[in-house]
């Protein structure tokens, strides 16, 4: 680390930086970061998008070999970036759809899964969204991420199935709330673990996703 030599062969997945730089330009007019964002997009195209190794970038999980600890977070965030930045480009929307398929296939659980004592699957609140391979359990922020992406995909394509899926996860979000305080709890489990208030950043992500979906439903009454 002292001389800049990588400590592991893992690649950075710079999606959060791309979205930050784009937001600085769109919201604050600070466009000097646009070229940096485009360079990061080109880097992503030659690495993660090419290999489809959406490995987790969590600060509390050690680096792993390729494909052992994938997560859907950066894949979904990049899909949201594509839908926001290039809403009229069919190829961008299709790439976002591919990323959504990956996230749903690997991390969304629509009904009670097979029994597994180690992860307490019989106590999960479903439908739910799992966080990462190394922590394959339902987390509220993971559900929030899929709610946001399903909503964005619906708004770009008009596919009512996307909206229906967003609503199903949102309904589960309300069932997972603390019944007394209304706080969005981190762990979607019907046990003592589920009573832990958990991470405030996860709760705020859930609140933002629910508010956004609520505004959409107030504007539209689609036939589901």
Where do the language-model regions lie?
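Glycan-recognition and catalytic cores of secretory/periplasmic carbohydrate-active enzymes
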Residues: 1-224
